[in-house]
Amino acid sequence: MQRRIAVVAVFVMIALAACASASKPSAGGTTPTPTSSPAPAVTPTAAPSPSMSMSVPSVSPTVAPAPPAPKPAPPAASTKPISCTGEIAQTRPVASGTGPGGSLVSTGSPAVALTFDDGPDPINTPKILDELKQCGVKATFCVVGFRARDNPEMITRIAAEGHTLCNHSWQHLFDLAKRDDAYIRKDLENTNKMILRAAPGARVAYFRAPGGNFTTKLVKIASELGMNSIYWHVDPRDWESAKFGKGTVMVNHIIAAVERDVRPGSIVLSHDNGKPDTIVAYRTLLPWLKARYTLIALPDAPPSPAPGAPLP
């Protein structure tokens, strides 16, 4: 029994010695580390050089749409004085005929009358007045009643500088002739009232229907108020910018139309209200016209009747 115990003890000692030997690192050895999966090898890709043959898809650049063409600006009005000298003989036939409703289209003499409608305009009317003064020319201004009320200083200046004032209705209704007689009469009387308030010594001897839409009834009522009805012989259509454009193209159109159509005795229609191209065109037209024609304001007639009651 004792022998067996001794043998077992020997084996236990041998086992313990083996365990102790395994737990110590060997000389020059390293402490083992946990094993991990190796990182995949990455082969760097070189950027293609210009010499490398590669198929590169072409990319069309995105082109922004072109901006819209700017609207033509009115030509800048020159401040240089206009020279209206010289004299050129002309042999064109005298203007004749009558307008709608028996209205006048000519002056009844070889003289030419320039007329400016729809004002007074606080911006453009002073400019055309300045041009007329530089050339020593008188004209006729067919003014709208409510604009005469709102710009009395312009009416005062027109009269003071020797131009003729013309009634162009209260608010430029194209269908004025279709209104009843009482309305038409009040419309014209109130327009005269505003003109005479600003220029007490003036005479309102003429009437022009809005759009030239005369009827015999309209002509008759104007006559009863002491006014002759005037149409025109030359219309450059300076108001039709939708057809003729704006800026330089309109200026050139106005000049060409007036020079082509004017005759001795012509009444020429133009517009000062909101028409800067017309003002620029007359810097060229005034010297051209004055060299060929006598330019007049339509002559005054007896004083207009006293204005009636205001419009309701």
Protein language model regions, located:
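Catalytic grooves of carbohydrate-active enzymes
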Residues: V258-P299
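Structural recognition of the beta-strand scaffold that forms the well-ordered cores
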Residues: V112-T115, A139-V143, T164-S169, A205-A209, ...
